[in-house]
Amino acid sequence: MRLRLATYNIHKGVTALRGRPRLHELRLALHRLDADIVFLQEVQERNERLARRSGPTRSSPLDVLSSSGYAHRAYGVNAIYPHGHHGNAILSRLPIEHHANHDVSDHMLENRGVLHAVVRAAPGAPPLHLLCTHFGLARRSRERQAGWVAGFLEREIPAGAPVILAGDFNDWQHAVDRRLRRVSGLREVFDEVERQDWFERFLAWRRPRGLARTFPSIAPWLSLDRIYLRGLRTHGARVLGGAAWARCSDHSPLVADVELG
């Protein structure tokens, strides 16, 4: 069975410079992605300041995003503050059997989590494990968080079970990438994708394998956002760029078509 995946750091649903709400633009953008499963980072499920500016509404930010065609969702709170909270989320067209959020914060200045959910591509199909994460800004924090993920995969997920690990890894030095590949046996979706853009091919020597540049969205240079797989095959992957996407977030979304089995 083929699935389309996407990962996207949505910058809390506001523009990077002026803090203008972009939820409805993001909803339309998610609809255009046409992904079966979307991994989101920096999702504000509650924001009283934004609610006051936008007027009375019964819909939470996650309600708005889910209305782009996703009947199933999971949300994990990472950071709580007086006017709201934010975290990671998974939107899915496939029913989510269960989910749990795991705190992987490394210090008091950053609240980080790994959201784990389980879906099945079809009745009777093996469980497909989804992990959505947003790693820390400090290298040592990221390395410890990668170690936590590696341990979780070893302890909690059967060796033959298919896994998708996606999110914003903040790994501009690529240490996390090397560890996840070496310890967990994961592959990144761009490993098997041939570069069509000559500039991308020219710069590929600066990054391990085929990691794609996603940040900043206005002129992507750093390879922060990724989709790692185990037990799935990649049929295509791309970064969506351009002015319209740059207006939605400071990250560019990453999309991959994969096959289970």
Predicted features and spans:
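Active-site regions of metal-assisted phosphoester/phosphodiester hydrolases
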Residues: 1-37, 68-261
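Short, flexible/disordered intra-domain loops and linkers
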Residues: 15-20, 47-59
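Acidic beta-strand-to-loop metal/phosphate-binding motif
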Residues: 38-42
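Short "lid" loop at the C-terminus of a central beta-strand within the Rossmann-like core
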Residues: 44-46, 171-172
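Short active-site-adjacent helix-start/loop capping segments
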Residues: 46-49, 82-84
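Phosphate-coordination/substrate-recognition cap region in phosphate-metabolizing enzymes
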Residues: 61, 65-68
